[in-house]
Amino acid sequence: MLVLSRKINQSIVIGDNIEIMLVDIRGDQIKLGINAPKNVKIFRKEVYEEIESQNLEASKEATADKLNILSNFVKNKFGKKQ
């Protein structure tokens, strides 16, 4: 893990198009500003972990019967790939 020190209004750059700026410090909390392209998904870690958990649970609910129904629908709707 890379650890950097920054002061308020200083930033770091990731790649060519992501900038993370330290906006404010109050007590034990900091505020970050993130400039990134709209196609880059940005989540707080606890939100991301919840999304992963829900996706995992949803995938467990996809039974073989449901997958077969979906497969048949796609084949009938779009035809088999040549």
From Swiss-Prot:
Its main location: cytoplasm. It is found in: Cytoplasm. GO terms for biological process: bacterial-type flagellum organization; mRNA catabolic process; negative regulation of translational initiation; regulation of bacterial-type flagellum assembly; regulation of carbohydrate metabolic process. Pfam families: CsrA. The keyword RNA-binding applies. One of its GO terms (cellular component) is cytosol. SUPFAM superfamilies: CsrA-like (SSF117130). Keywords: Bacterial flagellum biogenesis, Cytoplasm, Repressor, RNA-binding, Translation regulation. One of its GO terms (molecular function) is mRNA 5'-UTR binding. It comes from the Bacteria. InterPro entries: CsrA, CsrA_sf. Homodimer; the beta-strands of each monomer intercalate to form a hydrophobic core, while the alpha-helices form wings that extend away from the core. Belongs to the CsrA/RsmA family. A translational regulator that binds mRNA to regulate translation initiation and/or mRNA stability. Usually binds in the 5'-UTR at or near the Shine-Dalgarno sequence preventing ribosome-binding, thus repressing translation. Its main target seems to be the major flagellin gene, while its function is anatagonized by FliW. PANTHER family: CARBON STORAGE REGULATOR (PTHR34984:SF1). This is Translational regulator CsrA. It comes from Brachyspira hyodysenteriae (strain ATCC 49526 / WA1).
